[in-house]
Amino acid sequence: MKQNKHILFMQEAVREARKGLREGGIPIGSVLVKNGRIIGRGHNRRVQKGSAILHAEMDCLENAGRLAAKDYEQCVIYSTLSPCDMCTGAILLYGIPTVVIGENKTFKGPENYSKKHGVRLINLDLPECKKMMKDFIAAKPKLWNEDIGE
């Protein structure tokens, strides 16, 4: 997939992140794309739902609904931030072959582990994603630390 397509889909993930922020949550968004079409979208809703597990990628996968293994094999998941251990586990479990991330400076999940298991990682290193997280962490450091388990 061409870089500009990745940027377009990442912009949808950014929209999800901004939606989460407007709702009072953590600004991380995700979309699941199959054959050039978004089939799932989500954002971190741990705060909004009082959930321990509703990270953006988990919300996105949940909203995509049940899919066959062959469907996941044709997907790309986009996340505004490097996926954590839990979300990486779901990506590996369902065999999603490609993960496109907005940035990994704020938080770097188990990217090497993903690569060792055959996942292709593309880091767009977008200033917009970094700024969104920097601003959020400056405003709500305690909530951010809770989200990453610190």
What role is predicted for each listed range?
Residues 28-36:
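Short beta-strand scaffold segments in enzyme catalytic cores
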